[in-house]
């Protein structure tokens, strides 16, 4: 099964954190590296799924927000990944977002579903969520817990609706925030994991930071997480997410 993975570029190099490539391979899939000059329609026809990886901030200016704390942005990269995301989504391919990937998907969802802006809010900055800068912790170490739905995150068959607590790493400062009384949000968007970390007491009474969400009924299925499972080697997460598509690929090959 071929999983697309967009890569970044400098003036002289294309590059991607090798942890993403190893993550896809360890789950039993074939990574397909996609550079920004690729023909999106052609390349997506050869894919079985897409991972939108972490990276630099999504440029808030494009979405009508002031840039108050994003020191590195790349509007061309943003546009390429937006186009790639929608091409896969409209082809009903499963899309898995990681960190920046979650942020880009959430912003595109809010544009397409303006009614969701009443209970979802994109923050251009939140504190206490970048362990590399604030705590000098390596990427593969966990730094805080999130509450999560095991059913939505891992496809657990357990009937219990009680959230589980899982430790995660954290390397971001842009964030999606939801009103507590409103989650899960709508029929398409479901909050999968959340935390109050980074919120002051008054904010935490009414809101939570969205650490993971799923979207259905908007093209291919979508799951996005704010942490970095590729560094934690959580292969079960993407194996479960892409398993349905893998069955289709195998069936079509018979």
Predicted feature residues:
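N-terminal beta1-alpha1 cap of cysteine-dependent amidohydrolase-like domains
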Residues: 1-98, 107, 111-173, 177-218, ...
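Active-site loop->helix "elbow" adjoining a glycine-rich segment at hydrolase catalytic centers
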Residues: 100-102
């Amino acid at each position: 099964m071929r999983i697309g993975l967009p890569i970044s570029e400098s003036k002289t190099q294309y590059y991607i954190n090798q942890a993403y490539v190893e993550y896809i391979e360890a789950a039993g899939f074939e990574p397909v590296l996609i550079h920004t000059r690729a023909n999106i329609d052609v390349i997506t026809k050869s894919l079985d799924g897409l991972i939108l990886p972490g990276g630099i901030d999504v440029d808030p200016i494009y979405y009508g927000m002031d840039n108050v704390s994003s020191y590195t942005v790349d509007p061309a990269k943003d546009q390429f990944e937006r186009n790639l995301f929608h091409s896969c989504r409209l082809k009903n391919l499963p899309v898995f977002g990681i960190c920046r990937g979650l942020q880009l998907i959430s912003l595109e969802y809010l544009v397409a579903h303006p009614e969701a802006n009443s209970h979802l809010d994109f923050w251009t900055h939140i504190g206490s969520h970048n362990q590399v800068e604030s705590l000098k912790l390596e990427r593969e170490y966990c730094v805080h817990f999130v509450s999560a739905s095991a059913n939505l995150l891992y496809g657990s068959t357990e009937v219990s609706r009680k959230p589980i607590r899982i430790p995660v790493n954290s390397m971001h400062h842009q964030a999606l925030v939801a009103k507590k009384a409103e989650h899960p949000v709508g029929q398409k968007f479901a909050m999968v994991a959340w935390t109050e970390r980074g919120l002051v007491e008054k904010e935490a009474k009414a809101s939570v930071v969205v650490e993971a969400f799923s979207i259905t009924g908007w093209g291919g299925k979508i799951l996005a997480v704010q942490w970095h499972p590729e560094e934690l080697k959580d292969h079960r997460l993407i194996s479960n997410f892409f398993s349905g598509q893998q069955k289709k690929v195998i069936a079509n090959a018979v």
